[in-house]
Amino acid sequence: MSNRHLPIGTRDEFGPRAIRKENLIQTISQQFIQAGFERVKTPLLEYRDVFKPLAVSGEQPYQMLDDAGESVVMRPDLTLPLARLLSTTSIVPPVQWWYVGDIFRVKKSLSGTYNQITQAGIELIGYRSLKAEWACLSEAGKICRTLGLTHLTLELSDAQFVPQILRTLQLNDAAADAFQTAFFAKELSTYQNLIAPLATNPLYPFLQQWPWLFGDSETIFAELKRLLPSNVITDRLAPLQQTVAFLKDQFPELRVTIDLTSRPPQSYYTGIFFHAYVDGGHQYLFSGGRYDKLLASFQQELLPAVGLAFDIDAVTDQLPNAPDQPLTFVYGLPSQWQAAAAMVATTPNARLCLVDTLAEAQAAATKQHANLIDLSPKEAIL
């Protein structure tokens, strides 16, 4: 194995992109702090069992053994460690936390994606109110507005919509599993065969249209009102409708869509979930939702929770570089160190020229197309 190559799925970060990424992290962190969230940080290494509830198709964590022979992993997720933290300490919810850190997932070769991803997000644990979802979405909207991210589409869904329809259809477990598999995989011919025996069911017109129920929120709600009984709309869809109204009031620049055909990101999601992307983008800029089963793997008492996570790398790629400013070198004699440092502090894009002679300083400035500020009265023997 070469010592000159990086492992597949990793990269070095430097230059303008690294600066954009670091500035972005600072911007998001300050937003969370100003909103009253408390900082939380968990270890990079966790026991493998912490992530049992995590289901990410085609991805595996980096895994190793500790000195006791226990399986530990580099965290593939930042939410479950917070559930572990809450269940093993005397912290009393509700809590409002914010975090920033890297996650690691070994993805398929040639997938074109990276195994190391930086995330920044918030967790509101102990809140049942729909206001918790709104708080997450509000923070996300304000951050995107601050960053100047326009042409943003926010897609909303509900983790319990499919289960509720299946319960209404009164399918047995085997039939329900087959139905969900075909539906989420978009296997339309199989799906049509599965709904054919339900032709006399009052929901059959809805079932025929269901695979295409995604898009503009007003259009989808109008279709649902036409196709579904009123009690389903009231019970399951009212929170979605209220959330769409909230977003249109608070963030009229957002394009809000509904997708009632998508699988929840994880099995522990229990309500509204969401993600956002820009036109032409191939990655979600942020995502999140409600997961009231978050603590199911750690304790019997379940706690309501809502979370939001920004993909820092995806957002970084959407941000422009800062306007180019010419580099300036400041050169001075050793006795002028303090004066040179003061000049650097007050000169845009300046740095100390760490060479011994004026000739070397001039050569360095020429090589990097930089300006040169010479503080030395004359060349001297050092």
Curated annotation (Swiss-Prot):
One of its GO terms (molecular function) is catalytic activity, acting on a protein. SUPFAM superfamilies: Class II aaRS and biotin synthetases (SSF55681). The keyword Lipid biosynthesis does not apply. Keywords: Amino-acid biosynthesis, Cytoplasm, Histidine biosynthesis. InterPro entries: aa-tRNA-synth_II/BPL/LPL, HisRS-like_core, HisRS/HisZ, HisZ. The keyword Cell inner membrane does not apply. It comes from the Bacteria. It holds the Pfam family tRNA-synt_His. One of its GO terms (biological process) is L-histidine biosynthetic process. GO terms for cellular component: cytoplasm. Pathway: Amino-acid biosynthesis; L-histidine biosynthesis; L-histidine from 5-phospho-alpha-D-ribose 1-diphosphate: step 1/9. Required for the first step of histidine biosynthesis. May allow the feedback regulation of ATP phosphoribosyltransferase activity by histidine. Heteromultimer composed of HisG and HisZ subunits. This function is generally fulfilled by the C-terminal part of HisG, which is missing in some bacteria such as this one. PANTHER family: ATP PHOSPHORIBOSYLTRANSFERASE REGULATORY SUBUNIT, HISTIDYL-TRNA SYNTHETASE. Belongs to the class-II aminoacyl-tRNA synthetase family. HisZ subfamily. This is ATP phosphoribosyltransferase regulatory subunit. It comes from Lacticaseibacillus casei (strain BL23).
